[in-house]
Amino acid sequence: MARNKIALIGAGQIGGTLALLAGLKDLGDVVLFDIVDGVPQGKALDIAEAAPVEGFDARYAGASDYAAIKDADVVIVTAGVPRKPGMSRDDLIGINLKVMQAVGEGIKTHAPNAFVICITNPLDAMVWALQKFSGVPTNKIVGMAGVLDSARFRHFLAEEFKVSVEDVTAFVLGGHGDDMVPLTRYSTVAGVPLTDLVKLGWTTQEKLDAMVERTRKGGGEIVNLLKTGSAFYAPAASAIAMAESYLRDKKRVLPCAAYLDGQYGVKGMFIGVPIVIGANGVERVLEVTFDDAEKAMFDKSVASVTGLIEACKGVDSNLA
């Protein structure tokens, strides 16, 4: 049986972490691509030399030619400029849109049948542009956002309640920015909603609100601490969970930036919503009901993404 092939576009901090995790989880063979020649080859060799110690048999290759991603089953895109202190995700549009064009052409030529996961920021706009540039069917391309944002929320909740992260479920929807929507009503500890835990005295509404706000600012918190880049361990782990659900047909329900065609009242955009990822890519969009406050937050988040997409169209008229 042929082994899966995973192509990683961008051999920076996230790309290298993705490559290692793909091997540790035995997801397939890995091609690391980067335009800076030597970097993908060096990281690929370094991780390949870790394989005998960790006991996995994935084959690794590094490349600076898109031909190397030929017939990849999964393509994960991290290429682009990361955030630096003081930058918003939106500040990255001009630079990273050009990167998405080059990546999109590479995917269209060499791996048109791949399941594509975009991590590049500003996420919701970049996955939209990448789909346009690559021509990949909308059910075969998603953005990594909600899994990461939900993981951050779960971590904060587990710390507050002093329980295992395994027993904490959290859903963060909307755009991957400061207007994201952490849904406390749909978030639970061992099936008990957070709203009930407040009533039971496990925490206070003020503490819960603070955790929601910290989740929204989670990426910026790490950017400010690192000072030279942005998060990479948790984003990589999140994308690997998505890739694994596709490659192994696990049909996990994961919050991702997915193409909406009328669901949630949104059409023609990628927005963070719960989806089922299986062998056919995005197999289902789960539509949850909002109360008035949640609907207002979600609509505000969608408006922010709409603004980013309009900005993209302003930069590249071919996207209009």
UniProtKB/Swiss-Prot annotation:
Its EC number is 1.1.1.37. Transmembrane segments: none annotated. The keyword Plastid does not apply. Substrate binds at residues 83, 89, 121, 152. One of its GO terms (molecular function) is L-lactate dehydrogenase activity. It catalyses: (S)-malate + NAD(+) = oxaloacetate + NADH + H(+). InterPro entries: L-lactate/malate_DH (IPR001557), Lactate/malate_DH_C (IPR022383), Lactate/malate_DH_N (IPR001236), Lactate_DH/Glyco_Ohase_4_C (IPR015955), Malate_DH_type3 (IPR011275), NAD(P)-bd_dom_sf (IPR036291). It comes from the Bacteria. Keywords: NAD, Oxidoreductase, Tricarboxylic acid cycle. NAD(+) binds at residues 10-15, 34, 96, 119-121. SUPFAM superfamilies: LDH C-terminal domain-like (SSF56327), NAD(P)-binding Rossmann-fold domains (SSF51735). Catalyzes the reversible oxidation of malate to oxaloacetate. Belongs to the LDH/MDH superfamily. MDH type 3 family. This is Malate dehydrogenase. It comes from Methylobacterium radiotolerans (strain ATCC 27329 / DSM 1819 / JCM 2831 / NBRC 15690 / NCIMB 10815 / 0-1).
